């Protein structure tokens, strides 16, 4: 089926893990409310099941669920979704910088752009 072959991310990852896995190791981070308004949490459960089964390489990322949280939950367990939605930059820029520092080439400039 066309949709599955081209848009079902879990299916595509499972089908192509030998090729995609090494490129995505440590890069997959999924946050989902367990009461998603569109029931997307059900798809996330299936994705997590696949990711946890990966080997060579293991996906080495994270899947996190917000208890009673709705759509757009972003991983903040300390605040209600209506407030945490206002904090995307606060939360994810730090994670992006940590990833850049960890994976940057040895001669990369990691200081001049930080202020």
Predicted feature descriptions by range:
Residues 1-21:
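Mobile cap/lid helix-loop segments that gate and shape the active-site cleft of serine hydrolases
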Residues 4, 8, 25, 42, ...:
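Short, well-structured alpha-helical interface segments that form or flank functional binding sites
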Residues 21-24, 57:
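Extracellular/periplasmic catalytic domains that process cell-envelope and extracellular macromolecules
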Residues 29-115:
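C-terminal catalytic histidine-bearing segment of alpha/beta-hydrolase fold enzymes
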């Amino acid at each position: 089926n066309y949709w599955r072959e081209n848009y079902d991310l879990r299916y595509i990852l499972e089908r192509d893990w030998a090729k995609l896995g090494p490129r995505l190791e440590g890069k997959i981070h999924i946050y989902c409310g367990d009461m998603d308004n569109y029931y997307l949490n059900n798809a996330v459960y299936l994705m997590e099941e696949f990711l946890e089964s990966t080997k060579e390489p293991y996906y080495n990322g994270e899947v996190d669920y917000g208890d009673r949280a709705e759509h757009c939950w972003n991983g903040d367990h300390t605040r209600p979704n209506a407030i945490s939605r206002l904090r995307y930059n606060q939360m994810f820029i730090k994670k992006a910088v940590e990833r850049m520092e960890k994976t940057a080439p040895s001669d990369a400039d990691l200081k001049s752009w930080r202020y």
